[in-house]
């Protein structure tokens, strides 16, 4: 693949991940195993409120093809096939879920040194079509996306964004919700290993005159333990502690509290991911 700009979905992703990844209010346990033949098997159990769910996912890579199959307790089977270099600098992703036969989807991604283009469509009679394009370089890129409903002949979305990326920082601005919202984020790393960072995000909803400002941070206590925290102008405070109990095996404890309504019970989450 080329070393050009990333996908449109990559714009603002690093800042979003620091503010959202690993924060949860559920109890989750997963264990992953790997065979000598290249098959990866992951079993996951989740308790959300009073609801229990589980799934088993398997992944197998053969030459330029990657096969993913996930079976859950709702008796649904999700299959995803990813093919790289089917044509030069091109990737194809096909997915479908059984028994929901209308869920079949095909996406094609093309990577160039100065542009990235994707097209995705649901494989049914009147599909939804999504198209994205990004121009630029790994340092600075401009992108746009649009979704079109062939049944109603209307656009379901059209958004645009810009991203500036340096080794120690990332800035992004996204005009979303058909021009009704604006999100700007900035992420800065303070060490070469990217284990300590600060992030800020400003979100503006024009139709409701709503503003949300969120700041967050990541700090590595040592090589196996890290803490994260975030706070927004609505008073929502989140924090988590993540510890590597074994190589590649993580335990994460997270919590969230409304500082403007301390009488409410805080929310707690626990996650254990084992990768022997």
Curated annotation (Swiss-Prot):
<dbReference type="GO" id="GO:0046930">
    <property type="term" value="C:pore complex"/>
</dbReference>
<keyword id="KW-0496">Mitochondrion</keyword>
<keyword id="KW-0812">Transmembrane</keyword>
<dbReference type="GO" id="GO:0015288">
    <property type="term" value="F:porin activity"/>
</dbReference>
<comment type="function">
    <text>Forms a channel through the mitochondrial outer membrane that allows diffusion of small hydrophilic molecules. The channel adopts an open conformation at low or zero membrane potential and a closed conformation at potentials above 30-40 mV. The open state has a weak anion selectivity whereas the closed state is cation-selective. Involved in plant growth and development at the vegetative and reproductive stages. Is important for leaf and pollen development and mitochondrial membrane potential steady state. May be involved in ABA-mediated early seedling development and disease resistance.</text>
</comment>
<comment type="similarity">
    <text>Belongs to the eukaryotic mitochondrial porin (TC 1.B.8.1) family.</text>
</comment>
<dbReference type="GO" id="GO:0005741">
    <property type="term" value="C:mitochondrial outer membrane"/>
</dbReference>
<keyword id="KW-0472">Membrane</keyword>
<dbReference type="InterPro" id="IPR001925">
    <property type="entry name" value="Porin_Euk"/>
</dbReference>
<feature type="modified residue" description="Phosphoserine">
    <location>
        <position position="76"/>
    </location>
</feature>
<dbReference type="InterPro" id="IPR023614">
    <property type="entry name" value="Porin_dom_sf"/>
</dbReference>
<keyword id="KW-0341">Growth regulation</keyword>
<keyword id="KW-0813">Transport</keyword>
<keyword id="KW-0597">Phosphoprotein</keyword>
<keyword id="KW-1000">Mitochondrion outer membrane</keyword>
<dbReference type="GO" id="GO:0008308">
    <property type="term" value="F:voltage-gated monoatomic anion channel activity"/>
</dbReference>
<keyword id="KW-1134">Transmembrane beta strand</keyword>
<dbReference type="Pfam" id="PF01459">
    <property type="entry name" value="Porin_3"/>
</dbReference>
<protein>
    <recommendedName>
        <fullName>Mitochondrial outer membrane protein porin 2</fullName>
    </recommendedName>
</protein>
<keyword id="KW-0626">Porin</keyword>
<feature type="modified residue" description="Phosphothreonine">
    <location>
        <position position="236"/>
    </location>
</feature>
<keyword id="KW-0406">Ion transport</keyword>
<dbReference type="InterPro" id="IPR027246">
    <property type="entry name" value="Porin_Euk/Tom40"/>
</dbReference>
């Amino acid at each position: 693949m080329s070393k050009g700009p990333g996908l449109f979905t990559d714009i603002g992703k690093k800042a979003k991940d620091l503010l959202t990844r690993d924060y949860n209010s559920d109890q989750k346990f997963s264990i992953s195993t790997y065979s000598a033949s290249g098959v990866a098997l992951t079993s996951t159990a989740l308790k959300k409120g009073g609801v229990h769910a589980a799934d088993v996912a398997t992944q197998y890579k053969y030459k330029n093809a990657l096969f993913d199959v996930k079976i859950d307790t709702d008796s649904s089977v999700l299959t995803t096939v990813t093919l790289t270099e089917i044509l030069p600098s091109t990737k194809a992703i096909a997915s479908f879920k059984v028994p929901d036969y209308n869920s079949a989807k095909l996406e094609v991604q093309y990577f160039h040194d100065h542009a990235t283009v994707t097209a995705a469509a649901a494989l049914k009679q009147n599909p939804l079509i999504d198209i994205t394009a990004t121009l630029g370089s790994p340092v600075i890129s401009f992108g746009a996306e649009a979704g079109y409903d062939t049944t109603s002949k209307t656009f379901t979305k059209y958004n645009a964004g810009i991203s500036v990326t340096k080794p120690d920082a990332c800035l992004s601005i996204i005009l979303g919700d058909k021009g009704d919202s604006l999100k700007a984020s900035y992420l800065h790393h303070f060490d070469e290993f990217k284990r300590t960072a600060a992030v800020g995000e400003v979100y503006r909803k024009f139709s409701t005159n709503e503003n949300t400002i969120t700041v967050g941070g990541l700090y590595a206590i040592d090589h196996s333990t890290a803490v994260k925290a975030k706070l927004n102008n609505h008073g929502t405070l989140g924090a988590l502690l993540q510890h590597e109990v074994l190589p590649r095996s993580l335990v994460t404890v997270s919590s969230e509290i409304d500082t403007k309504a301390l009488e409410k019970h805080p929310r707690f989450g626990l996650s254990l991911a084992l990768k022997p």
